[in-house]
């Protein structure tokens, strides 16, 4: 007999089969009450990436509709089948459908912000199921010999930090590493205390980006019996130096483009564009 396995990745769930719509929500309750009620119902099927409750358009009858995004297509499908035409928290049945809008190819993958990575890992692995450590954290502001010094103008001072983080899963005997970089150009006459604060913020940004990259490599395998296995995606072209290497970040043949573009603050900007067609 085949073992059922659900694969969950640490990326923004954009697929239609991970998104469900709920409508025919009565205006009897407040938006906050509806949110809490829906969260209580649907989080029982699996960890949720997003839940939004919105009032109906003015041309429609008074009431609300909701969007729920799961990390797992299997969990979304199970939730849809179990709750469609059910009253749940109100006196009349709800309509629950999977999204049907065609996805655009360039929205195929987007990494999770670090806070959501933590939530997802804690949900399936527990607070002791994973650990992190800094392999190296380097100041790259003056790495002229590595070819990474940039023109900042007469009034600018470049601050740049690079970090390698290790993500470990002690109960599974597995680990992976991620690389992150953060930079900012400061005014040369800026207050020294402000420069010190910016240095600390840049080091944290580099560390957080490295952690996001490390989580991107992880696959959670949810077995039919509820147990969780771990797999690590290996990129044969990736260059991650050894821990004891000197000048570990100072290389100029690693592309940081995909890291810099993964701005976590913008990850939800396009969510509604992908799921605006409500099936009836």
From Swiss-Prot:
Subcellular location as annotated: Nucleus; Cytoplasm; Nucleus, Nucleolus
Disulfide bond annotation, renumbered to this chain: none
GO molecular function: DNA binding; RNA binding
Domain of life: Eukaryota
Signal sequence range: none
Keyword annotations: Cytoplasm, DNA-binding, Nucleus, RNA-binding
InterPro entries hit by this protein: Nucleotide-bd_a/b_plait_sf, RBD_domain_sf, RDM1, RDM1_RRM, RRM_dom
UniProt main location, coarse: nucleus
Domain spans labelled RRM: 18-101
PROSITE patterns in the cross-refs: RRM
Any single Gene Ontology cellular-component annotation: nucleolus
Quaternary context: Homodimer.
Function: May confer resistance to the antitumor agent cisplatin. Binds to DNA and RNA.
Protein name in UniProt: RAD52 motif-containing protein 1
Organism, as annotated: Danio rerio
Species classification: Eukaryota, Metazoa, Chordata, Craniata, Vertebrata
Encoding gene, per UniProt annotation: rdm1
